Amino acid sequence: MLDIQQLVKTYENGHQAVKGVDLAIHQGEFIVLVGPSGCGKSSILRSIAGLEAITSGEIHLAGRRVDNEKPANRDIAMVFQNYALYPHMSVYDNLAYGLKNRGVSKATIAEKIAKVAKTLKIEEYLDRKPAKLSGGQRQRVAMGRAIVRDPQLFLFDEPLSNLDAALRAHMRLEIKKLQRELGVTSVYVTHDQVEAMTLADRIVVLKQGEIEQIGTPAEVYHQPASTFVASFIGSPAMNFLAASIRDGKLQLAGKQWSVPYDANLNCNTLTLGIRPEHASLQPVDDAIELSINIQVVEPLGPNQLVHGKINGEYGDEDFIAVTAEMPLTIGDNLPIWVRVEQLHLFDEQEKRIPISAQSPSVDTRQQQRQQQ
């Protein structure tokens, strides 16, 4: 549906914001571009919209090349972070403005606006000016203005950044429900990994103008392609410990464990990744055992974050574990167990080392847990 081929964007100062990106997006798919500031996500979005000229490459929409067309001719609607509403116009006139410029009849405009206003629950605001609306109401109007155009593609440029935390959570749900209802292909830009995980059919993780990984939320969370993806997706972020592997055995702080990797794999320097929520306080089968020296405990209500030090291959390293709420003493050592199937190994280039030969016992237990 949307096909981006070898997209390059270089600015006049010589900065290359996008470095040969290839991305194919399917009809009706909700794609989220995520990454830190300067990763190229906004440059890609603005290039799709036609707000910035690309340096090289091609952009195709529904089989038609559009990168050489004016923005108004691309059949794309964009929702901005700052809403981009006309302050002197009523909500109705803001919704109608683009349709009037395209020569749509008053009757058709009224019909479209009535339908969109009902869908977004903004009927009672149609006579108000934007200044009389809350942030969430303005964002609904901004989305309504995009919807009435009936475009082939929606673009969202960090639309929730100006809202408070509670309203962001509510609007995330509204956007997801609306996109499912309309079935319009959508590309959404954010630096917030929670938005990416909750909204996306697929996530595109960007780093310094290049795609680091494309996958479903589950794939980028459970099978991160690199330490960058592993640290960016997930909150709290993944723990990283220096380790090594010899003949398929993980070596860490004088201990070793059999792990489901190539038996011939030998690596003096690798990174072991453990998600904080995968630390179990109870012994489990097929697991490695570690010990956290507790330094800080952050209570969060139903659970808590335990910050401490863990004995790694080259000395003490920072570690965070998510545990159930319980009394803990600063300075104590807290034993934890992590299933080998939940371990992540990364090589010297910080790329994921794939599991190659899981033991039947691990596979069986995984299947049993999935069936529960």
From Swiss-Prot:
Topological category with respect to the lipid bilayer: Peripheral membrane protein
Transport keyword on record: yes
Transmembrane regions listed in the UniProt entry: none
EC numbers for this chain: 7.6.2.10
ABC transporter domain residues: 2-233
SUPFAM superfamilies per record: MOP-like (SSF50331), P-loop containing nucleoside triphosphate hydrolases (SSF52540)
Positions that bind ATP: G35, P36, S37, G38, C39, G40, K41, S42
Description of how the protein assembles with itself and partners: The complex is composed of two ATP-binding proteins (UgpC), two transmembrane proteins (UgpA and UgpE) and a solute-binding protein (UgpB).
Designated name of the protein: sn-glycerol-3-phosphate import ATP-binding protein UgpC
Lineage of the organism: Bacteria, Pseudomonadati, Pseudomonadota, Gammaproteobacteria, Vibrionales
Gene that encodes it: ugpC
